[in-house]
Amino acid sequence: MTRYTEGNVALLPALAADLVRLNVDLIVVGGVRYVGVLAAKQATTTIPIVMESLATDPVAAGLVESLARPGGNITGFTIMTIEMAGKRLELFKAAVPTLGRVAVLSAAANPGNVLHAHAVQTAGQALGVTVQLWGVRGTEDFERVFAALRAERPDGLYMPGGPLTGTNEKRIVDFAVTSGFPLVRDSREAVEAGAFMSYAYDIVDQSRRLASYVDRILQGAKPADLPIQQPMKFELIINLKTAQALGLTIPPTLLFQADEVIR
């Protein structure tokens, strides 16, 4: 059985309570935000909870005792999206050697997005790239930010994932392409939609590992004893069609490194 918030996180406590009432054998919490896991944790201390793709440090968030031995009834997977911010920006710079200014477009009300944006800014200092932070507070705020970016003309855009940016994915990608901005994301779907490049965890590999954990728990393993795991495989995906539309020539060495090139 499945329960969805339809984008309304206020529904999470009721949805978690409903699953507990139904006495399910296990709860898998999807999505990158910790609030879903927190709602499940507050609803039950006995039903096993498996995190699918948490973007927050679960120890710092108070969800588990440690990565090696979570304790309690929660285990699962993180996606290291913030930790990979520097590598993502480094690859962006390798793809566009003239990259001097990057605008990070993120959800201002999303704590994970804010941390992610600051991680990109820190990485930029080491790479000689000026990183400008642009916070979007809601869907109605995009046009204001788009107009400002057209005036500022950064060399590229970087967008962390999240509910707000994900819901407006096509709108943002279309803006980037029509305005002449290469856009770097942390999801395959964004590049397939027309974004310039993505460097992110391999979702297929992560899903297989998630299924293995679910099976082990249903066979009797305790979540407290199963370490929190991080991604083992990452994918570099480049949209060559978008690069050509933007007039960019990707260095052959980087194309060779790519796991997938969309032509």
Question: Whereabouts are the PLM-identified features?
Answer:
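Short hydrophobic alpha-helices and adjacent helix-cap/hinge residues
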Residues: M1-R263
